């Protein structure tokens, strides 16, 4: 009987030992995978910023191009002024605007009238990306997001130093219907935005997503997305909000007045 008990104890010990070893291996692998996923997310974001900035690779890798030409800066949405750190103490290099928007202490809840993009909350501090060549700023990139039919759609918009002319746009995260709303990522549709004016002569948001197609030569209009009216409405709401007083409107006004110099 004692021999049987010893055998059972040894078996249990082996099982428990193996379980502990396996759990340690799995935990270590999970941590490593999570770190790799974060690194890949950062690289993908930098890649989209470099792309919309129109920077040529010339054999260089994305992190090198980003470090050389892109300068992230924080902006106080209330004033449109640059700030050195966000309310939570973050600097531009490590600021997470999405995370800040979820925290009551670092964001505001939007009213139904204000919330044209259907984002519910907006961080108090935003981030922009200056495209630089030495000390000279050639463009500014603003991140925008708004709700489509099925998903929150995130984009980067490159704007010339007049604070008004679009030089590029890229949607880098969205879950709209492939072939319909998902066409926000189509290069042909994105190409329409180049040269469009964000504001009218009175400095009011003027971008229009036109169902059926924008008139030829329109300064402010881009074609709607065929079969994806609600996604198009989401794009419209996104620009109505982020170009307005609650978004980057005050900041772009300062850019227009030479605030980047």
From Swiss-Prot:
InterPro entries: FMN-bd, NqrC. Keywords: Cell inner membrane, Cell membrane, Flavoprotein, FMN, Ion transport, Membrane, NAD, Phosphoprotein, Sodium, Sodium transport, Translocase, Transmembrane, Transmembrane helix, Transport, Ubiquinone. It catalyses: a ubiquinone + n Na(+)(in) + NADH + H(+) = a ubiquinol + n Na(+)(out) + NAD(+). GO terms for cellular component: plasma membrane. GO terms for biological process: sodium ion transport. Its EC number is 7.2.1.1. Composed of six subunits; NqrA, NqrB, NqrC, NqrD, NqrE and NqrF. Belongs to the NqrC family. This is Na(+)-translocating NADH-quinone reductase subunit C.
